[in-house]
Amino acid sequence: MSMSQSALIKEEISSVSFQFYTSDDVRKLSVKQIVEIESFDMLGGPVPGGLHDPALGPTGPAERCATCSLDFIECPGHFGHIELAIPCYNPVSFQTIFKLLKNKCFHCHHFKHGKPIINQFIEELTLLFKGDVVKARNLRERNVLLRGYEEKKKGKSNEEGEEVMESDESDSDKMDTDENKTNGKIICDGVFNAKEIYSGKATHIEDFKREVFKEFFGSFSGYAIPCGNCGAYSPRLRNGDASKSKLFIMPLHDKYATKNSAIKLPTNFSSVKEQTEHGTWFAPWEVLDNMKKLFENEKEILDMLLGHLVPIVTNKGGAKKNVGRQFTKESNVDSLFMRVFPVTPARYRPPNFVNGRRSEHPQNSHYKGMVKSNKMIRQSIDAGEGKAKFLVNSVCDLQMHVNNMYDNSKSNSNTNEVANGIKQILEKKEGLFRKHMMGKRVNYAARTVISPDISLETNEMGVPQYFAKTLTFPQPVTSFNYNQLAQAVINGPEQYPGANFIEDENGHLINLSKESQEKRIALSKTLLTSHPHAPRGVNKKVYRHLLSGDYVLANRQPTLHKPGIMGHRVKVLGKNEKTLRMHYSNCSTYNADFDGDEMNIHFPQSLLASAEIREICANNYQYLVPRNGAPLRGLIQDHILTGVLLTKRDTLFTKADFQAILYASCWSVNTKHPIVTPPPCILKPVPLWSGKQLISAALNQLTIGRAPLNLEAPSKIPTKMWGTKGLEITRDSHVIIRQNEMVAGILDKGHFGASSYGLVHTCYELYDPDVAGSLLTLLGRMFTNYLQSRGFTCGVDDLLMKNKEEKFRVETLKKANEEGYTVAAKFADLSKYDEQKARDFFSKALQSEREVARLDGLLKKGLNQYTSKVIDTLIPGGQQKPFPKNNFSLMTVSGAKGSVVNFSQVSCLLGQQELEGKRVPRMVSGKTLPSFQAYDASARAGGFVMDRFLTGVRPQDYFFHCMAGREGLIDTAVKTSRSGYLQRCLIKHLEGLSVQYDNTVRESDGSVIQFNYGEDSLEIGKTPYLTKFPIIAENYELFKSQFPMEQLIEQLKNQEVVEYNRSIKTQPELDPVMSKFNPSSDLGCVSESFMNQLNHYIESNPQKLIKTTSNRDGKINEKDFRNLMYLYYSRSMVSPGESVGLLCAQSIGEPSTQMTLNTFHLAGRGEANVTLGIPRLRELIMTATTKPITPLMEFQINDSTNKVETEKMAKYLEILKLSDIIKDITVQEYFQDTNRNYDIEIEFIPTLQQVLSLHRIKEKQLNKLFGEFNKVIKRQVKSQGKLKVNNGDIGLGSKVRGSDLVEDDSLTINDDDAPANDDTTNNDENTSQQQPSSQNKKSKSKVITQDDDSVAAKSKNKKKQNVNYEDGEEEAEEKDSDEGESEAEESDDKSDVDSDSDEISNSRSSNSFSDESIEFDQKKLTFTISVASDSKKVLMLGIVETEASKFVLKSCKGITRCFVNEKQVGGKTHYSIQSEGVNLSEIFELRDKLKIDEIYTNDIYAILQKYGVEACRQAVTSEISNVFAAYGISVDKRHLILLGDYMTFEGGYRALNRIGIENNTSPFQKMSFETTFSFLSKASLMGDYDTVTSPSSRIVLGQIVKNGTGSFTIVAPVK
């Protein structure tokens, strides 16, 4: 091994540019042309000129290279090449060629844009490449206006069929000269220096560049656009077979051929004289000729668009000289085509041996295909004209093989045997990028099962000796460690502690396992002697075994957040141990348990890495979780229980026991000082020590030489558990520690578990992390020792209840079962429950999901009261054994294990079983299980389990319970992958965000995302105690001892800040102090909220500790306290280099694994669905959707306490369908003459007039709507029977929404809202002028769809409704396909909506029906439909019911239903309206009736469109926060603010997916995310480059990431 790990690196890659190899490049690279199809001859030797020619390098260990004469290990391999018989398209750039051809003129071979417009684009791009994005954008805005003017002018002259007027020509000339002038000013000479190139890589520039490219290639690619230079019309091109990259040139349309011949220009642009209507094959060599001419004529703009960076070399005095770091952009037509194909070295295509027979590498098939096609083409060319068709096929075959080499997915072959292309090798998880270049596998790592060990310290890791002998560290030999390392060399690899290798000064390794004892002794003596030819200043190194005291990284997968990898101090275990050992307190950090989990350890190989692990990464420093700053480490289960038992009042010890426990816990702490036993707390009859004294003694031992601790904090166990008599302080529920003496309270999970503001957390903050770690170790040992003598168990008597409470339980549960019948009667509108009537009602009503949900809601609400009543009465008051004697109760209350839910399931009842948030579903028969009756209304039949585990669960109830359990298991399995991908998207986008030395948060390209991290520059882990002023004031001396206070104040004091803070008090309108000064260097420059809280504390002075004018007895001077808090703020600031982007991604990704997957949750009063959990996070973050699954708004009317008016407004905004006002439908069928007649009678609900007045629909409009409905029915009958309907014509009118026919002005809807549910009208009068009927129907048949179940439930039909699910889906599909509706149609809609109903009735009169056809009064509507008697019979009732459930009488676009919610504010009930669907424009129209400044909506895109990007940013933050809050998960707002800032940084709403990463400036980062091949192709085509600043790109190139400790370099002083 000649290369040493410590070899000095003299150069590193600072940037990488991407481009294609040209034919000349490939020829220079190649050592051999491949011409033979066969690779091996009959004897198995390589064929010269074949794919395994010896010149390409050896393929096996026994061979030597014919080119460089090196063996298999040393030879890197050499490229070959295949000369293609004809030029082929580069598969990557085929689409670009197609775009260029569409934009070029086939007559003058320029772009069709014309010179002035081309110059505009050149100007914009030059400014952009210089990095001046502001000037470029301003120029672009001006140019876009100019371009619009030019196009209009052109369009006019073309329409009139006239030549362009002379004046216009002179205008354009003048403009051209103007452009050239500015051109000269801006463009200079197309030379860019390295600084400009770096500054040209920014997110906004990438975004702008994409805009320009899109416009350039999109604006003139149309077929009917004449050339801006010569006025010629060019033919249309057709893109043929994708696998063979074929192009066809279509004949010129007669109209344009005439125009061309009029100005004496050609009309046939193909080499073939007779063209078919399908077009002529456009041969690649013809395309190449065309492209060459284009690249010659349009060099300047093409260099900008497709050029790659080329260093400028001058040729002074005959010698080539590189000019500084200057570059120019050059494009090359050769990069779009392939004349030569490179062949990879033979070592990368080794033959496979199966059963002794050699088979070639799959990739060879692509090369062979090319060689074969080459030969065919040459033969066809030699044969002449007769083989033309044969030639075309061979050319296509050659192109296909070239394409397959790049990407085999486009192959025509149906078999899966096509070898992988380059795309398949690079992409996906197993591809080159993600599996290899991003770094996955490492050396010096070990993995085995983990097991707990209580005698280890919390920061230690027990490592088996087997691992310790294999993992080594390269220790440089010095005079200080010579003896130790010499002994290690003598011991050798087998005897521990020994060494495995010695590395000499030249980097050569000596393997000690092959050396004898004598040789090892001899080698040990030469460790300090240096070789005469060795480089100076280099020591020998001994690869010694892993020793106790070394630091390793430990990791458990999945590593969801930063503490998933932590540093541990090694404790090497005995010979026979086989598992890794660790302390219990690390379990919650790694999310580990000991049921077979495995973990990895990594041994760092440099002293620098070891130092970072010890000082930054060590697990004592990972006490707080970055997600919200809460503690993560703590003692668990048995320890928590023992903590309660040890510190409660009646626990007393003799001197021997006390000292035994105290020594067992403190033997390793401050070992230079004796352990002091305090005086006993009880002297007579015998001296006894309490458990609280053990804690006091341990604290005294731990804090020797430091100020003692003062603490007051509540315990987790509630006060009521200790009884209700006496003072609260006598009930041990509040811990009080004074000067290290524990005087009251008990220690439980709240103090040494993973809980905030407890004893351990306070020690972590007031002393240091190592003290907190030692305290956890000490308490763990203490509790274990006590538990060994005390013991703990749990018996059946812990679970029993008193007789009185048992009776209460039985009676309450009887009532609960009857509650099912009560609710059912109420639901069915019966005065009392009648089984038959209820069953009939339920059999119809429960067909609708909406009604099932309503019944579930009512029953759950009723039954929950009974469940709560039973549990509250029985626990803890009804237990036979009271707390704390009751061990089961002790477990659940102290937080050791289990909860009240577990206790209640054992002793009270199991309660309501739910599946996906609903009660147990019914089968088709109406039963929940075969053992219950159909539509049984009892609570038990619906899954309410009244049994408990103590006395047994009946089979039916057990089955329900198992159903609910199974759902949880499936949920866990499914959500893992969903949340995993979500976290990956977050990580790849946010990885480059870090804090800089000016306190800003920047992307790796230097773009500023935030000016202060989280708006206050504070680190989340340092903020928990920042505003806990009482604790800091009580421990003032202890806290003060952490800082060299006077010295720091002197350094950081700034009088200007003091003055500014004073003036803010009197002038609150001034800017915050943080916007004027630097918080990291100016004392007192703190956030507004911190300043306000500090001022409030000092003014109120609750503990009277601060010395003020009103309180002279205080201990602490106000000025000193203020300065201390300012220093604390400075110390709590986020460190420069912190990877806040990664922390944000982990803090959102990690808790998402705890969410359940169930999508819907009932919001508000329990009727409107909202998406929650991972699906909601995905639509907010990953897709940044413009149409959320469940959009909703919430708003109030001006008088929000008025329930009646609120309900009226809710009704007014709701959609009203015909089925909502129908009571009954009857159809009579009879024959008359030669017709079959259907008399249809629709009976309306009695409250029709009230409904119509609420929705503001007039009778005149209703008549019109019924006429429309009649037409809809006829059209349905016609389509079902495919027959002619006799009564009058059927108009082409489609489904109609009522808002088209309602005259109320307030329902004028603007179309600038997100088109969530776009409904459009169809005017029958206009059908003759519109497109053919089929197209018309397609483009104008959008109806607000709603799940049909709800419609069925709301209509009061006596007949069973025929709900058709497929219809809903089809409509949804149709809606999607119609998204690109033209603006003209939209403006039509507006005029339709706004028009007066009288005009509508006039406009429709030409096609309306006579009064005999429809009869309508207040109670019913009748009409007749006639069809020919020989026609197929149709189910008329079904048609009418289905169409009535779809026919919209009135709607407010986007809003389907509204609910009224109520909440109590200041003793008053306030009502708000919650709508399903969002339409902000409509709400704005009603601003005189609604509180317009108090609208809430969860549709972020609608907020962006209406309120702008700042509101959008706030909405993103609050919506994500709401998703987590629903699951009780807290994520610090700083993470959410950062994510909101990142997503809205570009001024829009950016998705965290592959579309959102498009504007990222690092091609490597994009490639390592997704669609590697696509991003690589784009980078090569555009001549992109990577400045190697993003973490991904640095990892790809094997460099240290520039975040954290990599964000600076350490320079040694040179003396």
From Swiss-Prot:
One GO cellular component term of this record is: mitochondrion
Q: Quick one: where's region Bridging helix?
A: 955-967
Keyword Nucleotidyltransferase assigned to the entry: answer is yes
Locations listed in the record? Nucleus
Q: How does it assemble?
A: Component of the RNA polymerase I (Pol I) complex consisting of at least 13 subunits.
Q: What does this protein do?
A: DNA-dependent RNA polymerase catalyzes the transcription of DNA into RNA using the four ribonucleoside triphosphates as substrates. Largest and catalytic core component of RNA polymerase I which synthesizes ribosomal RNA precursors. Forms the polymerase active center together with the second largest subunit. A single stranded DNA template strand of the promoter is positioned within the central active site cleft of Pol I.
Protein name per the record: DNA-directed RNA polymerase I subunit rpa1
- The species this protein was found in: Dictyostelium discoideum (Social amoeba)
